């Protein structure tokens, strides 16, 4: 009979049920990539708006999920990335301080642009019985749009608050928001307006 594996001290936790979930895409970033300097200012503004929205939604029992790129480093973990970005000066460090993850927030790492692709997100949302997504993050015309597209294909109801996303140019952001509204049927009202009402039991 084999020996028992050593105790890790990690206890499984029961996932909360949350019909609506807040998905924060790629806000935790060094901004150290081509175009990062153009994204920095708008990203910080989007992070501040997303932080205010997160606080309001948390009061309503909405769970926040951070979905962040692993940057191709398969040994990486989310909290190490947070620690790295906290030590940075400028917008990258300020974004992390504004949107610093809380104890009851959930986190996943993603290997590609969409938060759904090759990640545990879909299983996580199923376990939480989530039917509506509020998608905020970077960049509007890349990871946010592709995540919204995958959510649309999976028949989630999606709200992409226009002031809680950022792109390298205003035209890129506006074009992506228009596409998500027209083609992906996303609500793109800003976070300063009342949130969309909950989806009915019949869908």
For each predicted feature, which ranges?
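Early exported N-terminus immediately downstream of N-terminal targeting peptides
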Residues: 63-64, 68-83
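Short, basic, glycine/proline-bearing loop/turn elements
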Residues: 36-39, 79-82, 133
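A generic "binding-loop/recognition-motif" signal
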Residues: 27, 70, 140
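Active-site-adjacent betaalpha module
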Residues: 1-21, 52-60, 84-203
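Generic enzyme active-site microenvironment
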Residues: 24, 67, 161
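Short acidic, Gly/Ser-rich segments with clustered Asp/Glu that frequently serve as metal-coordination loops
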Residues: 28-33
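A short alpha/beta connector and helix-capping loop motif
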Residues: 18, 36-68
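Short acidic, gly/pro-rich beta-turn/loop elements at beta-sheet edges
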Residues: 35, 77, 118
